[in-house]
């Protein structure tokens, strides 16, 4: 049998007869973070997502020397950066719920290809963009990026950390399954080892660690919402143990992280629900949720501890248990917390056509419960726990009346005196494997003017009034982080946390990266204007 070795390559190749085997010898690797945004997970600065941390942990397990850089930092120093000193480069990116970002510019696969075009080592792709579902930075559109994915040697369709582990263990691309998912038992080591990467982030220590509690969704029992990738990727919920989550947070906290979002799940109120594999709207497991958050507080003293998603149907249909969960979140989390409700539509025809399940009555009840339990103002200047509402357009069954129905329900919420922290309005993307088709998108294009009209109407007639209710004039917002200088006498900043308010700060002598206390003096449509309070004795809490 003819055996030949080719060694003048960053990827050593062995040819055995007619077979070509690529042998991996990775001593040094780079993680290039192009950011991620998914239905149940965020990895755009100021957040550091789970993908780079877990990938770092898998590489560290095999004693690989790992560097980490964000795409924004890489663009700054690209001319001086020698990529060929690495045996492997792991690129992370992908968007299933694209948004607008104040101080970050995510990468695309096309950009990654242009960066690595002359790179000789192993090229690995991870994150949502590596999956069959695709990625989109723009609502209502999705591009065919298969030609860019083909550029990479390894495309982690499953879990990036699992693929990296197998690659390093086996030493050969041909022996690994790019579709493999990791178990929570093996994830524990990756998560704890990967905590070290936070110190390599250019914004350290001012970053928020996104923490995973579970993935999958009870809605998978009937296929899930028509547009959503979560149940299609992960099926029914698989829960992470409280101890594993707490231990990861302890390590991250000891590495200097003081900001956390327990955000990588479709519904915080459904964590460890006993009937999650039998019921689409499972009863909250109050004991498990208290064990988790109490445990987090026992090992850390975070400046920010927030959540993300919550299913309003769970809150409304299990009122007693949900009130207890909300009280736990108020007790252990910091104020300014937001439970994002995936309402998507108040139109019952759209709800039925897209298997959304949650009714308008569910939403109104859930909004009422969180306002009653979480509406008191806390030390940050914001209420402890408020709902957010996500609305999605371009769904099946959408009609002209849908826009009016959605607006009327938002108006009812306002007229009843409730507070909503944010209203997120976006267009659906036809991801692979979901029930949304290009035909649905083309139909939605015909209603583009209606969509823009609706968005403008909500911003003018709901958002502005709601801001004045959530943060009345005179409210002091503590620890606003100065991020951008717009002009000589105007800066923009935000507090750390879930869905922070954009604050325009009227001042001439601020520094980017400093924290200031700001008094609310005026309002934009979705932002506020404030002035710095420098005399601590003048600080008071409004409401």
Swiss-Prot record:
Residues 470-534 form the TRAM domain. Residues 203-460 form the Radical SAM core domain. Pfam families: Radical_SAM. It comes from the Archaea. Coiled coil: none annotated. GO terms for molecular function: 4 iron, 4 sulfur cluster binding; catalytic activity; metal ion binding. Keywords: 4Fe-4S, Iron, Iron-sulfur, Metal-binding, S-adenosyl-L-methionine. InterPro entries: Elp3/MiaA/NifB-like_rSAM, rSAM, rSAM_horseshoe, TRAM_dom. This is Uncharacterized protein MJ0274. It comes from Methanocaldococcus jannaschii (strain ATCC 43067 / DSM 2661 / JAL-1 / JCM 10045 / NBRC 100440) (Methanococcus jannaschii).
